[in-house]
Regions:
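Phosphate/pyrophosphate-binding catalytic cores of soluble transferases and nucleic-acid-acting enzymes
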Residues: 1-264
Length: 264
């Protein structure tokens, strides 16, 4: 998939290592310096809008202190009553965050509740304030889009390809290494569903169905997120007749206009 292009931040951490947005931004900034020092332009690719936003706008997370006792209480609630119950609490105090954060992303739900508990403020409002900051970077924020039916077809094909490429065997190996569903590394789409299958909670067919369904929901949430971002440049694949060369030409033209790259 990398097609000879140097990629960063892939296969850098062990499955049991903690990973969060602050660590992502710290690591990404180091690579940005390295790439710029090489005289090249970095391309940030991905679908997690919150992480992209945090990097582009240099969002400050220092106000988000820690209350270990309260955090443990929330973790206990999630274990006893389930992720949806905890998500319901967040929905009551911060509906905007509840809309943006999936119930299964327990760590982010807890972080949002903890922020509210400590500051009396909604983390969604804090993030919105941070989002209004001027970015220290000159950048172009492209989001490719397509009609929903075609997007869902691509998601289904991708999930099928993941299974064929050995996702079950990969999760089986991770499980044998002691990786559990509580770990951040096992919260990714596909991993927790296959883990449920390996634990006897569902059939493989059911697990695949759930992965496809949850990936569609994720795509829908991400599109909603990107629509809120003020600097997004939308590229409708259908409008370009699904011509990748035409899309690339348009992107290059915009990059030249923004003086991110120079005219050849």
């Amino acid at each position: 998939q990398m097609q000879g292009v140097t990629h960063y931040m892939i296969d850098e951490l062990e499955p049991d290592e903690e990973f969060h947005v602050v660590r992502f931004v710290t690591m990404a900034k180091e690579y940005l310096k390295e790439i710029y020092a090489d005289g090249k332009i970095p391309i940030i690719a991905g679908g997690t809008g919150f992480y992209i936003q945090a990097l582009l706008y240099d969002i400050d997370f220092t106000e988000q202190q820690c209350d270990e006792t309260y955090r443990r209480q929330l973790e206990d609630l999630a274990r006893e009553h389930g992720a949806e119950y905890l998500h319901g609490i967040l929905r009551e105090v911060d509906p905007a965050s509840a809309e943006a954060i999936h119930a299964n992303n327990i760590k982010r739900v807890i972080r949002a509740l903890e922020f509210y508990h400590l500051s009396g403020k909604k983390i969604s409002e804090h993030n919105e304030t941070e989002r209004q900051k001027q970015s220290p970077y000159n950048f172009a924020y492209f989001v490719l889009t397509d009609e929903r039916a075609k997007l869902y077809e691509r998601i289904d094909r991708r999930v099928n390809a993941m299974i064929e490429a050995g996702l079950v065997e990969e999760v089986k190996k991770l499980k044998s290494m002691g990786c559990s569903r509580e770990m951040v590394s096992m919260q990714g789409l596909g991993y927790k569903e296959i883990l449920a299958y390996l634990d006897g909670g569902c059939t493989l067919e059911e697990a695949v169905y759930i992965i496809k369904r949850e990936t569609r929901h994720f795509a829908k949430r991400q599109l909603t997120w990107f629509k809120r971002e003020r600097d997004v440049i939308w590229l409708d694949k259908q409008a370009f007749g699904y011509d990748d060369a035409a899309i690339l030409k348009d992107m290059i033209s915009i990059l030249e206009e923004k003086e991110i790259i120079s005219h050849e």
